[in-house]
Amino acid sequence: MAAEEKDPLSFFAAYGSSSSDSDSSDEEKEAEKTKNRATKRPFPTETKKLPGPDELFRSVSRPAFLYNPLNKQIDWESRVKRAPEEPPKEFKVWKTNAVPPPESYQVAEKKAPPPELDMAIKWSNVYQDNGDDAPHANQAKCLPEEEAQEDSPPSDDEQENATKKHKV
């Protein structure tokens, strides 16, 4: 693959140079490079681990902040810094606009229209079509017949006011 790679400047080489001469010189150069790489490796193939703290301080003097005349061993656990513990968080229910599960559905009951309401009566009232053929609602009787007869009929003034309001 490396032999197949050509020098990008070979296009500008002299007219009479042959490609076989350049191939052999490329191979020689690559062989020299690999030899130089092999001899230039200063690192050994085995990697050494870093020494532990106790082993390190045997060969190096201890810093003053670690000196404890009573205890010759270093208490590394007391030197460790830990993050403060956070209290457990309370669970809060999220407020969402998501659709609730089907078990929690409650069918909203709609009120039925009153039984005496009839669309023919409603439209008749809207257009004030109160002719003979106009539908009339059944008058509900709240009072017993005896008490209804005792009530006096409305006076003439009340009837005039009612007709004026109705003729608007």
Curated annotation (Swiss-Prot):
> Hey, what's the signal peptide range on this chain?
none
Compositionally biased spans, kind Basic and acidic residues: 46-56
Question: Which family would the database say this protein is a member of?
Answer: Belongs to the UPF0690 family.
Could you tell me what this protein is called? UPF0690 protein C1orf52 homolog B
Q: What InterPro entries is this protein classified in?
A: DUF4660
Q: What Pfam family does this protein match (any one)?
A: DUF4660
- High-level lineage: Eukaryota, Metazoa, Chordata, Craniata, Vertebrata
Q: Region Disordered: which residues?
A: 1-56, 124-168
The superkingdom listed in its UniProt entry is Eukaryota
Question: Which organism does this sequence originate in?
Answer: Xenopus laevis (African clawed frog)
- Renumbered to this chain, the Acidic residues biased-composition regions fall at 145-160
